[in-house]
Structures are given as structure tokens and as C-alpha cells.
Amino acid sequence: MAPTMAETLLEQLNTMTVTVADTGDIRSIETWKPRDATTNPSLITAAAQMPEYRDIVDGALRWAEDKAGGAESKRIVALAIDRLAVEFGLRILGIVRGRVSTEVDARLSYDTEAMVQKGRYLIQLYEAAGSSRQRVLIKIASTWEGIRAAETLEKEGIHCNLTLLFGLHQAIACAEAGVTLISPFVGRILDWHKKQSGRDSYPPADDPGVLSVRRIYDYYKKFGYKTEVMGASFRNMGEIVELAGCDLLTIAPNFLGELSKATGKLERKLDPAASSTKDIARITVDEAAFRAMHAEDHMASDKLEEGIAGFSKALVALEKLLTERLRVLRGQARAGHAAQEFFKVYDLDGDGIITREEWGGTESVFTALDINGDGRISVEELAAGLGAAFHLKSA
């Protein structure tokens, strides 16, 4: 049936795809009311700078200080980061009907046992607060070690979201491991191909990121895998439109806003019935095959390493923010803005500008901070505040 004039693209998308809010800003989640929400260190760092969330930050630090029992500040901050992620997750679960994704420290991405222990610990925090593990996805990078950690956690009833996924070999390994959900990064795949080809743009239907998600979706539906596909990291509306029908799409507030205003007929582009009839060869992906395929896929190997580095930098920035706030709570420093310290974390070449490549974290936060839209963040723009810029993006 053709849509009525009142049906926006977002309303139509919601009939065929689960929309997920890619934000840690509780106000944005209240506005868009998605079924699920995802968070990561970049988003939490942004949200933690907003005055309205100061009580969550301070509460996490006080809780960590009590738990640490006189330990040094580094240990307190480490505990507070986990607590803060869970506290934001709990607030989000009070709004959404479905699930929230909470990320394991990206610096553990090649340590299977450490990721298993961290996943268990995060779930313990959620359950101690009265939340069901069925509503939480533990987000882990799609390294071979991360996939093995997720396999262990899934067997314990701890559901996982495998992120930083760029290649079919990663997707197949995740499905074989019984992972609940994967997050292929559409926009970052596009970024790599644009840089390699020198092209400024691709038609949405030929966007390399879109084609990658379609291939994964078709493979999963062809062979009956239960793992859900959640497209992530979008650069433009065209990518979202071309993936209508995907199991889930995690969308930043600015694109949710555009979708809620746009009208016209939205065609379903991905359909399980159509995928099941396609001629697709089954691929075996054991560890040797995974590592060989990953080495051959320069895009996937480049972007996975870059993504882990980016999320790790975001954690360093969050650690600096919490360390400074802990000093304030102890009366050892005045409340101030940590912009200069954050800037040093990301300005790798010390030229006074943060490029998208140097940032490496969540695109929606980068775009929000890039107030003049020139593709670079100056110290003045960062000094405007992660939180303030984040609200500009979600308004």
C-alpha cells in the first residue's frame, strides 16, 4: 500500500527495520524513542560533559572510590568507567523497550579471557541494579579473539554485539559462534574506498559499505543464521534508504531527524525471502581461514585496527575527564574544562587540528564538534564542549 502524505521515511522504515539510536544522550533517546540504543566511549565521553549528567558521573566516581578501598586514582577511574557505562545504560533502559549495547574496553580486543571477564562483570553490574541480562548486549570488537570471547559469553546467556565488522569473514565467524548481533560499519567502509579510489562519492546503491551489508545479509538469510545484522556508521541518508529492510539500523540523531522530516515512498531493499533464493556458496571460516582472509582484505584489516585505536583513544579521553573530576570532588582542583587534555589525545601530529583520521571514534561526535563543517576540529571547537556540540548534533 502506498504511503500517505503523513508517513515519513522514518515511519516507513520502522515498519520493516528496527531503528536503534546511536547516542549516549538520554534526551535524544527520549525524543526519538527507538526500540534499542547503542553507546560507546566516544558517546559516553560526550554525554558526560553535559551538566545534566554530572550527577551520573559524580555518582560513578563516588561508587568507585568506595569500592576501591583506598586504591590509587587510576584504579578508581577504571572502576568508574565501567560503572558509568552501566549507569548510562540503565537510564537508557528506562526509556527504550528493547536493549542497550555496552562496550568492552577496546584495549582488550586481542585478549579473549579479559573480554570474557569484563563482559561477565558488566552483566553483574546490570543485574545487581535489577536489570535483566536479556536487555543488554555486550559490545566487542570483531577480532578472532573477540569472536571467541563472544562465543563463551553467549553460552552463558550473555548476549553480544560484535562491532567494528568490515568483512564477510568476520560476519561468518560471528554467525558460526552463535553471536546475537553484528554491527557492520557502512560509512567507514565507504571512507576507505573513497580514499583508495580518489572518488568523492558513490551512488547510494553502489556504495561499498551498502554492498558489504547486503552481502552479509544475503549470506545470513540464505543459510538460516539467527545472528541479527545491524548496519551502523552512516555517512548519508542514501545509505540508510538503500538498507531499508535490514534487521536493524543504528542511526545517529541527526539522521533520525532528517528521516522524520522526509516523505515519499520508501522501498524495501533487503528481504529474507529474496535472499534465501540467491545462488551463494557456503564458506568455511576456521581460525586459519579467518586470519588468511583478514590479511587479504586490506580494507577490513585497516579499518579494524583503526577502529580499535579510535575507541581506545576515546577511553583515554574519558579517563582524563574522570581523573580531573575526581580531583575536583576531592577538593584538589577547581572545576574546569578538560578540552586541552582531550585535544592532546587526538591531535596525533601536534599541528593544532584534529582530522577525522586522527579522531577515529564515533562519527556523530566528530561531526558535532566540527562546528564549521570543514572536516577538522580546532581547539576552539573542542573547547566549546563535547556536550554542547553533541546537543547541536541531536537537536
Residues of each region from the PLM?
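Acidic Ca2+-chelating loop motifs
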Residues: D349-W359, N372-A383
